[in-house]
Amino acid sequence: MSLKSLLKGFKRPKKIEFNTEASTPNYGKFVAEPFERGFATTIGNSLRRTLMSSIEGAAISAIRIEGVNHEFSFIEGVAEDVTRIILNLKQVRIKYEPEEKDQSKIIHLELKGAGYFRAGDLAVDSSIEIMNPDLHIATLNEDANLVMDLEIQRGRGYVPAEEKKKDIEVLGTIPVDSIFSPVQKVVFEVSETRVAQRSDYEKLTLEVWTDGSVSPDDAVAQAAKILKEHLTVFINFEEELEEEDDELDEADEKLKASLSKHVEELELSVRSLNVLRSLEIDFIGDLVKRSEEEMSKSKHYSDQCLQELKGKLSTLGLSFGMRDF
């Protein structure tokens, strides 16, 4: 069975609505509709789990401090002990794009005298961007001489320090718990939506928060690609996959032609045309997106006009409140 035949009759979103007004580098809201009942929950939950666990990011994986052999040490001239410094370093959010895949980076720091060690001090070159540069790491007095190396790696999810101990080669290197995931929170909501006269379809609203090293829309796109690649192994009709998913059948072509017509082609009365002009509706596609309540806002509106418009749309198999095209 071809992919086109397999999907016949299924209502699926044609595009994702991205709320640009509310979006920030750390937050994005996405709306997709319509879905057949049950599909919005399935897709929303799958995207949420993938976003939280499988998007790649960067984090500090190990540190080495001159004169320190283990994490339960104190450093002369530094108020915080090594354990507290490590806890603070775990919170640093980093954007790092290596020149070569799986390439780690060593940052060398030398801090002398009184002052504050903040996350922004780790941005030693253009390949490193710190997303929370004001994060406090340590307080130094005039006797301080803090010399340290930090290793930055890319990865997925959460990797505890215990798993890294076997890879430590340099004496005095302390492995650090790494939170690689740039996605901090994902919430999805499923609600009912109407398509023509049916109100039993579903709308998926997805909200994504990141640390800024990856934009929310990029994170969603990556999650969708990961899911897609995992599902292809279950497909055993490869030839059908080559067909264009969005290929329009004859009915779709007819609908597209109707929606692109100018409203004057409906041969309406002057009063009804005035209603459409006052609402700046020029094409049938614009008209069917409106609700009956929206139409009543025109000063030329009358029940007779509404009935005429509904009748004309009905002859084309259309109605008010259509959004699925």
UniProtKB/Swiss-Prot annotation:
EC number(s) reported in the record: 2.7.7.6
Transmembrane residue ranges: none
Region spans: Alpha C-terminal domain (alpha-CTD): 254-325
One of the record's GO molecular function terms: DNA binding
Keywords: DNA-directed RNA polymerase, Nucleotidyltransferase, Transcription, Transferase
Keyword rRNA-binding on entry: no
A Gene Ontology cellular-component term: cytoplasm
InterPro entries (alphabetical): DNA-dir_RNA_pol_insert, DNA-dir_RNA_pol_RpoA/D/Rpb3, DNA-dir_RpoA, RBP11-like, RNAP_asu_C, RNApol_insert_sf
Domain of life of the native organism: Bacteria
Subunit-structure text: Homodimer. The RNAP catalytic core consists of 2 alpha, 1 beta, 1 beta' and 1 omega subunit. When a sigma factor is associated with the core the holoenzyme is formed, which can initiate transcription.
Domain notes per entry: The N-terminal domain is essential for RNAP assembly and basal transcription, whereas the C-terminal domain is involved in interaction with transcriptional regulators and with upstream promoter elements.
Function comment: DNA-dependent RNA polymerase catalyzes the transcription of DNA into RNA using the four ribonucleoside triphosphates as substrates.
Descriptive protein name: DNA-directed RNA polymerase subunit alpha
Organism encoding this protein: Leptospira borgpetersenii serovar Hardjo-bovis (strain JB197)
